[in-house]
Amino acid sequence: MRAEIGPDFRPHYTFGDAYPASERAHVNWELSAPVWHTAQMGSTTHREVAKLDRVPLPVEAARVAATGWQVTRTAVRFIGRLPRKGPWQQKVIKELPQTFADLGPTYVKFGQIIASSPGAFGESLSREFRGLLDRVPPAKTDEVHKLFVEELGDEPARLFASFEEEPFASASIAQVHYATLRSGEEVVVKIQRPGIRRRVAADLQILKRFAQTVELAKLGRRLSAQDVVADFADNLAEELDFRLEAQSMEAWVSHLHASPLGKNIRVPQVHWDFTTERVLTMERVHGIRIDNAAAIRKAGFDGVELVKALLFSVFEGGLRHGLFHGDLHAGNLYVDEAGRIVFFDFGIMGRIDPRTRWLLRELVYALLVKKDHAAAGKIVVLMGAVGTMKPETQAAKDLERFATPLTMQSLGDMSYADIGRQLSALADAYDVKLPRELVLIGKQFLYVERYMKLLAPRWQMMSDPQLTGYFANFMVEVSREHQSDIEV
């Protein structure tokens, strides 16, 4: 039966910059490692492609001057706050988000990382940055037209049957326009802001110099400031190549469509003839936002099927193929007129390398099949840096206390938030710094839990024959892998 499409369906395309950090970071799954914009472990090919060129010294000097001016303005505002009551540290913290906004896109991106990583930067600082928005006025029309000529060889009026000059979303890295192809297909066109690459490159050079200075102090060395900035620079450079976003999107969905559980998942079609490093053209999709439960029910769609598709996307993508969507907030998930979930904005992708995937499968096998908590503890040590070593018997008991409830209740009754808090406490006790990829995938499960409560509150996941079959097959594969390793 075809669902009736009402006024709740609307055209949609989004990219993460247009959403406040508060919406992205409504869940808190923090162990001890910050979550950077993309998680990419063991993959160097894209990193090599996405490196930004070093800017000339005069350009860097100009950005240093601009940065110094903004810092001076912050100091003046801070001095004005001093007569007020309250600790001076809190007064400084309250000034920082506005300073980051004034400094521009690179610092706004870094501010969004602070907002989503209270475990690394502290709750009070993180809380202040959650209101940081990345919305700026659109670029000048003539600059946009020049970019089209440079990237696609002609102006938008000649490339498209129609092109809306006014973008419907505008942020520091890119802006997005509606357009229509000559073939009649409606599309959205994401355009990189002219000149942004050089500005970001200059800012990153400044941040790298600053990180070198910060590491002269003990706190800077403990936070690995240079590594943090280097990783941030790689990820931001990758975000500036729209071809990588399009490739990630297509690779991800092709993995999922290989299984029947992937039938309710789709992504916008990329129009490669109109896609380059700085222009990304995709089909325009109409749909209902995933957290609009009333509209989804009114349209006649099955909330259980939608939640199953979301869970499958994280499990199959992350644990089997090592590629998962890294930002499942509601603005990136819509339900189309066929009842499929449309995933948007693949600027944030999580990548888990084969070794870590193997360790994760071994951890699942040790905890849930063999109930060998000592073996599980050794696997955790292999997965991350354990700062506090304890006797093996005590570590095994601590893991057993954590894992036993997982084996005694159905997953449908579990709270991923509670599991996250317990795991966080366990990690704190041992000073475990798990790979950021695992922290990132944990956040996606918390988003899914929220949608589960909205769309399928009475659904028992482990009573569902389709999912139990999927997990049973997964565990059989893990057992076979384990057995073959023993035989070898």
Curated annotation (Swiss-Prot):
InterPro entries: ABC1_dom, Kinase-like_dom_sf, Prot_kinase_dom, UbiB_kinase. Disulfide bonds: none annotated. Pfam families: ABC1. One of its GO terms (molecular function) is ATP binding. GO terms for cellular component: cytosol; peptidoglycan-based cell wall; plasma membrane. Coiled coil: none annotated. PANTHER family: CHAPERONE-ACTIVITY OF BC1 COMPLEX CABC1 -RELATED, PROTEIN ACTIVITY OF BC1 COMPLEX KINASE 7, CHLOROPLASTIC. Belongs to the protein kinase superfamily. ADCK protein kinase family. This is Uncharacterized protein Rv0647c.
